[in-house]
Structures are given as structure tokens and as C-alpha cells.
Regions:
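Regulatory/sensor and coupling segments of signal-transduction and defense proteins
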Residues: 1-278, 282-330
Length: 330
């Protein structure tokens, strides 16, 4: 599936710009790494499970470093420094800032490897995307829009169209706002307009944005901050260890899966965007002013879901129940 996504993305880039596709494909193929272990399942299920966990821990700390198949005397990716850039150096000398962004989705000071290029251009299908960080950051302003502002929105977006904004810069979010439509909140940031315009057209676009902000928000500008929420279950290892049969372990897994299915509706109710939810592990983007309330709701939901799996603690008279710890970075 990953190769299907990368093939589609790389083919689109290849139509408008040169890049080292061979190296990019090798880098994407090398991205994912899977470990698995197995051991005989005998009558003592807890012992077999502990043996499997021990083998997995040993495999994870066994480091092997095969030589890369794409190494060359080129710049490293500026995103993580792990892989070589696949964008030719000539492109930065020959193209304008606007052209670099339009063709590669790259700023002049950036270098992208195949994985970075895939992240900028990859499409996973309708309904399977999440909001951009700029859209999340703009959400406090977007929530203030109402039907009275529809005319102002149409006028602003219409001006951007008249100025020649690329078609793929509009109607890009997976879920429409009641007034702002499918347009990304990054259009509310003056500095982001430099990705689409330059010179006199940039000045006109920024003036149109300023007029829009004045009319709809009394001149208030969006703050460039958003929240990253990461949640992880507490006492889960000990809880698993207390499941003495396959049936009990499966029941615990089903309950954790049930919680994961409840996460996306919760995150969306707080105007956030879920990146990942699996068992007791959650990663999401949220507007800053909604993050704490979302964290409390997730923790309460997890506690209710896991209430049947409390166990006696070390003292013997104290019940320990799985809970959810939530961290928020802004």
C-alpha cells in the first residue's frame, strides 16, 4: 500500500519537475521495519507470553545497520538528516521560490529525501486525511465565523482565485467548515501566502487577507500555535500480566480496541484531527484552547472502558485500575 501511495505521488511530481526517483523509491522501501517473534504455546500461557515478550525485547535492542543502496555525494534531508536529498541542486539555482514550492512543495532552504517528498505530496484517499497544523492553529478564528461572514469568505477566496492561486491550494481539507468550506486555515496566515504569490500579486493577496480579517474578526490574526496530544495507558503491562488465559487476554485486547474506536469522534468533537489511535496509544492535533478538555474526556473514557480489569496491587488490599496519561505539547 505504501508503494501505491508513493508511486502516485512521485508520478505527479515527475510530470512537472526532475528528481532522483530511483533513490526516492529505495528510501521509501527502507522506511518501514517489522519485528516478530514466536515461541511454542504450551499449557502455561503466562509463561509462554513472558517468553515471547523477552524475545521481542531482545530483538528490538539488536541493532543491525545494512549499507544504504542510495548513498551519494549529495545534501542530506533538512527535515531529519537521515537520508540524502532527491531534489537536484540545479533546481534551487534555476527556480524561483514560488516555482520551488509549486513543483516540489519545498522552501529554498529545505532539502527533501524520498520520504520527505512523499510526506509533502502523498495522498491516501478521501476521508483518510487529517488537518494541516496551520488549519488547527487557525481553528479558534474559524470557530468565530458564522453565516453572516459567508459573503466575506467568498470575496476573499474569489480574490485569491483571480490572482491565480493554484487549484490544489484550495478545497484541500478533508472535512468542510460550515462557512470557510474545504479551504485550509493556512490561508488566514499572511506569511503562508508567500507560498502561492510573489511581488505585486503577493501584496494584493495580503491586502485582501487584511480586509477579510478586519471585516470578520475586527483585525484579530490567528496565533501560530497548536497542540500535539499524546496519550498512553498506565499499568498496561501489569494488567496484561494479570490475564492468566488466552480468553482473558483477548477480552482485554477487545476492550482496548473498543476504546480506540471511540477516540476519533471525541477528537473531532473538540475540532481536532486524529493521527493515530491503537489500543491505549493516541496521537492527535488539537486547537490549543480545546486540548485540555479533550485530554480529560479521553482519560475518563479510557477509565470507564477499562474498569473491569482492575487488579490487586502490591499491598494486596488496593485495587489498581488502568488509567490514561495524556501529554500536551504546544
Amino acid at each position: 500500500r505504501l508503494r501505491e501511495i508513493s508511486d502516485e505521488a512521485f508520478s505527479r511530481v515527475e510530470k512537472v519537475a526532475n528528481f532522483d526517483r530511483s533513490a526516492a523509491e529505495l528510501q521509501v522501501d527502507d522506511l518501514l521495519e517489522f519485528f516478530w517473534v514466536s515461541c511454542p504455546l504450551k499449557d502455561d500461557y503466562p509463561r509462554s507470553r513472558r517468553r515471547a515478550e523477552s524475545l521481542m525485547a531482545a530483538r528490538k535492542v539488536t541493532r543491525d545497520f545494512p549499507a544504504s543502496k542510495w548513498a551519494g555525494p549529495v545534501d542530506k534531508s533538512s527535515l531529519d538528516g537521515l537520508r540524502e536529498s532527491v531534489i537536484p541542486r540545479d533546481a534551487y539555482r534555476e527556480m524561483s521560490d514560488e516555482e520551488l514550492w509549486k513543483k516540489y512543495r519545498v522552501a529554498r532552504g529545505e532539502r527533501l529525501c524520498g520520504v520527505g517528498l512523499l510526506k509533502r505530496h502523498g495522498r491516501r484517499g478521501q476521508g483518510d486525511d487529517f488537518f494541516s497544523t496551520s488549519h488547527i492553529a487557525a481553528m479558534p478564528l474559524l470557530e468565530r465565523l458564522n453565516t453572516e461572514h459567508r459573503g466575506a469568505v467568498d470575496k476573499y477566496i474569489g480574490t485569491l482565485r483571480d490572482l491565480g492561486i493554484s487549484s490544489d491550494a484550495l478545497d484541500t481539507v478533508p472535512k468542510a467548515h460550515s462557512v470557510f468550506g474545504y479551504n485550509d486555515g493556512h490561508l488566514l496566515f499572511s506569511e503562508r501566502l508567500t507560498e502561492f504569490f510573489s511581488g505585486e500579486r503577493l501584496e494584493q493577496a495580503q491586502e485582501a487577507l487584511q480586509n477579510f480579517l478586519e471585516e470578520c474578526f475586527d483585525g484579530d490574526r490567528p496565533f501560530p500555535y497548536y497542540a500535539i496530544l499524546h496519550a498512553d495507558g498506565d499499568h498496561m503491562g501489569t494488567t496484561i500480566a494479570h490475564q492468566e488465559s488466552i480468553e482473558k487476554h483477548r477480552a482485554l485486547s477487545r476492550r482496548a480496541s473498543s476504546f480506540a474506536q471511540k477516540v476519533n469522534p471525541i477528537v473531532e468533537s473538540f475540532k481536532g484531527s486524529l493521527i493515530y489511535a491503537g489500543g491505549d496509544d493516541v496521537l492527535a492535533l488539537l486547537p490549543v484552547h480545546r486540548a485540555i478538555e479533550c485530554a480529560l474526556t479521553l482519560a475518563d473514557t479510557f477509565r470507564q472502558q477499562m474498569s473491569d480489569f482492575a487488579f490487586s496491587g502490591a499491598e494486596g488490599d488496593l485495587l489498581v485500575q488502568p488509567t490514561l496519561s495524556v501529554g500536551i505539547a504546544i
